[in-house]
């Protein structure tokens, strides 16, 4: 955990207090003043030790002074990784997973750092500065330190003989934020991997995109900034899930939470190891089409059956992400009534159904890799459920809409060399020609040209353009999926990225012009 370090005696004492509160019940304990006494003994503010000065810089610096301060930090020897860590911790402490812009921004921290590792020498900090600028700006809009959501929490003893994740799930379903927070605090005192696996019980009650992507991006971030921060970053998802129980439409959450245990039991997946039966290309392609065309419950059942047959989880995950990819390639774009500032009719960037579906499928696939056996199976079943749900959620005739690239654009291409094709792709991006950009990158891959150069082009605009909160995350989603998808299908992901990049061009990200000048100097 990442509050001020405690001795073993202090921790056991806190657990003992939690046990008494649990025994008496929250209401009686409150009447007796026990919960207040426990709270009075605890510090009121999270402290991040050696990182605290940097975290404070992220929260307190006026946004118009932030970028020069960050450059000074780099020049004084501060690692870029530490700036990312400080930004993430400042975000978590301020928003606690409860602010729309806030949780989108923390989900962009790890992708921005991964992008930084791909940038030209001297410009590595650009994608990180983009996200940190957005981060500090939103912290000030939210009210700064006085509006912090996360505070130290006392652990509540977990009942012996019970699965911690089930207890967390029960507290969430009761909408009991205090019990959920205290239960997770106790679970997070153990190995971070165990805390993550317990958390997924609560996450798996529904397939809302933010509920799904937030824990995966937090887990990815822990690999960069240290797993000792697991409690702070993962408890954001606890709070998100509890809050979601009170949202309008929460009653419709019922199907996943009923369907998942049914399928796990029906296919006898609990207690068995994942299979290792590798799939041929034809199977992956056909299975992705099955998922795409099915109802959500049918898709979930198909994934459970494939797991029971011993199909390799990686291949099932690959099919799920390819099904999600179709939602970008087939999308007709935002309808006139859906336009908002920065997202005009016909656009597919930002929170489009395709970007959301791909980010969700990527998260489920990665949580299947990171989780234990139960959560591997559960993540793939729910990933299949969600991609089918995403196809129908916002309407549209996705089954009959033609995927990009269409023959008209492909036949019109005359260039074959890599440089000329990339130039044509860039012209299409700058002209917001989504279909043409997709066709050019499809042809570029079909001819066997170097994907690194295509990614470099897309990355340039993922950094420079605003992207409506999704540019960095979606770029990273495509990078991960391209690298883990077989050769026969991987260029579908880059083709989708080309389309999204063309959609988002023309809306420069705040702070990027200043950051560019500072780093060049």
Regions found by a protein language model. Give the residues of each.
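Mature, well-folded catalytic/scaffold domains that follow N-terminal targeting or propeptide regions
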Residues: 2-521
